[in-house]
């Protein structure tokens, strides 16, 4: 890819998209961008949203992980005692931003008051 991009995120990432990326095929611009990220060693964060997971889903997640992608499940934490749905969303978004190297204050860090 000739475009200089530091990092990519696909959020949400369907299992269809994840499977396509895992197989190395490309049928749209999202698949192409993910393929370029992997081949050029750039940060790629995939945020799957589906559950339960089949063996095929798990194998595809392992394939993209081994290729260098980060698989970040859209599974919020609860230790920060969320009060609203937005708190759960911000938790997942904050984790994604962390993986992309983007500073954020969406949730309290461990040990912060």
Model-found features: residue ranges?
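Glycine-rich, flexible loop/turn motifs
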Residues: 14-17, 25, 68, 74-75, ...
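Short flexible/disordered coil segments
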Residues: 26, 50-53, 71-74, 104-113
């Amino acid at each position: 890819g000739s475009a200089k991009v530091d990092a990519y995120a696909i959020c949400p990432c369907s299992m269809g998209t994840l499977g396509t990326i895992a197989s190395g095929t490309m049928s749209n611009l999202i698949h192409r961008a993910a393929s370029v990220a992997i081949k050029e060693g750039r940060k790629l964060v995939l945020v799957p949203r589906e559950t339960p997971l089949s063996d095929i889903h798990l194998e595809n997640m392992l394939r993209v992980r081994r290729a260098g992608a980060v698989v970040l499940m859209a599974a919020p934490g609860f230790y920060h005692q969320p009060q609203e749905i937005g708190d759960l969303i911000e938790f997942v978004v904050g984790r994604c931003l962390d993986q992309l190297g983007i500073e954020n204050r969406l949730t309290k860090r461990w040990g912060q008051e």
